[in-house]
Regions:
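A membrane-interface helix-boundary motif in multi-pass transporters
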Residues: 83-99, 302-320
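Extracytoplasmic gate region of multi-pass secondary transporters
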Residues: 148-198, 293-297
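Cytoplasmic membrane-interface "Motif A"-like loop-to-helix N-cap segments
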Residues: 1, 212-223
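Helix-to-loop junctions at the C-terminal end of transmembrane segments
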Residues: 202-215
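Hydrophobic core of transmembrane alpha-helices in multi-pass small-molecule transporters
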Residues: 18-37, 243-259
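Multi-pass alpha-helical transporter architecture, strongest
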Residues: 108-115, 267, 319-341
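C-terminal ends and interior cores of transmembrane alpha-helices
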Residues: 1-18, 224-240
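Glycine-rich segments within core transmembrane alpha-helices of 12-TM secondary carriers
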Residues: 57-82, 104, 282-296
């Protein structure tokens, strides 16, 4: 994944190879997203299956802050890069964030090679050997799609309440506030950075809540809160007040989004059996990210264009998707993962 990100920064310009440049960019972005699924699933399961049962929620919530750290670093680098002259930014400055990703590859490889399989998975492999079924009859991907496709579908729906408001606030709202409200893009980016910083303690808080109340209850709360905050978020944004706009982001992201994101590792992993947990969690989560999050900026842009760049339909879309996630959480089993041996 790190190599693919670095290669994006090395792409030749359109003037050099023409239409091949955007084609290569699409391919690299596809590969990047594909590999993120494997990285996220592996990191999440390592924490979930190593963690002691009564502290699993808070510890697995910390694993989700890795993405927030990336968002924080990316936003910070982007703010620095945008200080370059426009010509330099468009010529070579945009490459800097991608090239800097190479600095993270070696530490990641070092940590990866020092990790062993989790106790839960080792216990499963031991039992498998005892039962004389060392040869797997079916690949995990095929097995999980055939046997636990309902869990995959549930995760896709569950991700709407988490992904839609996140991409709405960090992508669509930045552009919309700049063009329609005349708010400087840097102002919104600073607010986004603040919410990223606040997300660290909020993830721990919601992780602790999941240990006490269960993942499903926290997820239902978060989804309903997102639905309730869809319209107020835009009202606060329209105020053009830094304090009120920040409040809108804190409510939608740090309470709504963070409560959902924090419990996803334990919640999603608990929906699958150990031999297919990695594949099932990753497939469901990443398909959900594509369907729920990837298309959100485009859907929001199209909906806003219906009524002369109004946000009303956009907020309505957030409400509907959040309610769908709340229903999915209601019917999903709040599975308790076994304690690590």
């Amino acid at each position: 994944m790190g190599a693919v990100t670095f290669l994006i920064g090395c792409l030749p310009s359109y003037a050099s190879i023409g239409a091949l440049t955007p084609a290569l960019l699409v391919i690299l972005r596809f590969l990047q997203g594909f590999m993120v699924g494997g990285e996220w699933g592996g990191a999440m399961l390592m924490v979930v299956e190593y963690a002691a049962g009564k502290h699993r929620g808070r510890l697995s919530a910390l694993s989700q802050t890795g993405g927030l750290t990336g968002q924080l670093l990316a936003t910070g680098v982007f703010i620095v890069v945008t200080q370059l002259p426009q010509e330099a930014l468009l010529s070579w400055g945009w490459r800097i964030p991608f090239l800097l990703s190479a600095l993270l590859v070696l530490p990641g490889l070092y940590m990866r090679h020092r990790l062993d399989e989790t106790p839960v998975f080792r216990a499963f492999k031991k039992q498998q050997a005892i039962n004389h079924r060392q040869q797997r009859d079916e690949r995990p991907v095929v097995k999980v799609v055939r046997e636990q496709w309902r869990s995959i579908l549930l995760i896709i729906i569950l991700r709407f309440a988490e992904s839609v408001p996140f991409f709405l606030a960090t992508v669509f709202a930045v552009s919309w506030a700049t063009t329609q409200l005349g708010i400087a893009s840097l102002t919104i980016l600073y607010i986004v950075m603040f919410t990223c910083l606040l997300a660290y303690p909020m993830h721990v808080l919601f992780g602790i809540m999941s240990d006490r109340r269960g993942c499903r209850q926290v997820y239902i709360f978060g989804a309903l809160f997102v639905a309730a905050m869809a319209f107020p978020f835009f009202w606060l944004l329209e105020s053009r007040s830094l304090i009120l706009m920040t409040m809108g982001y804190v409510l939608l992201i740090n309470i709504g989004h963070n409560s959902l994101n924090a419990v996803q590792p334990s919640f999603f992993a608990g929906l699958f059996h150990p031999p297919v947990r990695y594949s099932g969690s990753s497939i469901g989560a990443q398909l959900g990210a594509v369907v729920a999050g990837g298309f959100t900026p485009f859907i929001a842009k199209a909906l806003s264009a219906v009524y002369d760049n109004s946000w009303t339909l956009v907020a309505g879309y957030v409400v509907l998707t959040a309610l769908a996630s709340a229903f999915a959480a209601k019917i999903a089993p709040d599975t308790v993962l076994p304690h690590s041996p």
